[in-house]
């Protein structure tokens, strides 16, 4: 009788532990999005993006008469993404709207290079491809990144403020939104 109870307790504990471990492991179940600003940190398409950028707002700070770039990237550790498209909407500070003709979207292209040190090939960002119907429909291999760039341009007439908007990456019938923040400073 005691053996049956002990066996029942062991089986219950094993069932709870296995169910718990299955629900805790979530890495790679869905694509992750990353937001970051122009910096010296460039990431190749095979590199793991830093956790600090995951679901972070892509934030740029700029003065008047300047151009700055915010980056948004998507990656899925488990599966290939198809039909990947990038879009963005209006940016507003609640009072003013950032001029739409002063925002441009680009898809990052990557160049393959060889490292003599590591004796291996790697990729690094190479150029910006303007988004259009042809270039804005792509495939992202599993465990690779695809970055997109939003270039903002201010003029002397652009009102200072903190402009907020959304960028979206659609894929395989799904969609991920990420906040983009543009801080325009008037130093005159």
Predicted features and spans:
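Bacterial N-terminal signal peptides that target proteins for export
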Residues: 1-10
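Bacterial N-terminal signal peptides
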Residues: 10-18
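Residue-level detector of short, conserved catalytic/binding motifs and their immediate flanks
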Residues: 13, 70, 165
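Sec-dependent signal peptide cleavage junction
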Residues: 17-26
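Surface-exposed binding patches on compact interaction domains or structured appendages
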Residues: 25-54, 78-150
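Contiguous beta-strand segments within globular domains
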Residues: 55-78
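Extended acidic/polar, glycine-enriched regions
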Residues: 73-90, 135-188
């Amino acid at each position: 009788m005691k053996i049956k109870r002990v066996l029942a307790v062991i089986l219950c504990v094993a069932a709870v532990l296995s169910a718990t471990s299955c629900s805790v492991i979530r890495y790679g179940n869905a694509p992750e999005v990353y937001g970051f600003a122009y910096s010296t940190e460039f990431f190749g398409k095979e590199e793991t993006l830093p956790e600090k950028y995951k679901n972070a707002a892509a934030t740029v700070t700029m003065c008047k008469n300047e151009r700055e770039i915010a980056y948004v990237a998507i990656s899925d550790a488990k599966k290939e993404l198809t039909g990947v498209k990038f879009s963005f909407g209006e940016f507003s500070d609640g009072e003013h709207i950032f001029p739409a003709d002063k925002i441009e979207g680009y898809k990052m292209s990557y160049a393959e290079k060889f490292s003599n040190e590591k004796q291996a090939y790697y990729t690094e960002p190479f150029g910006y491809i303007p988004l259009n119907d042809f270039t804005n429909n792509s495939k992202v291999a599993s465990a690779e990144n695809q970055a997109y760039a939003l270039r903002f341009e201010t003029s002397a007439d652009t009102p200072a403020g903190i402009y907020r908007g959304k960028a979206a990456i659609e894929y395989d019938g799904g969609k991920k939104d990420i906040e983009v923040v543009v801080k325009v400073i008037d130093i005159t």
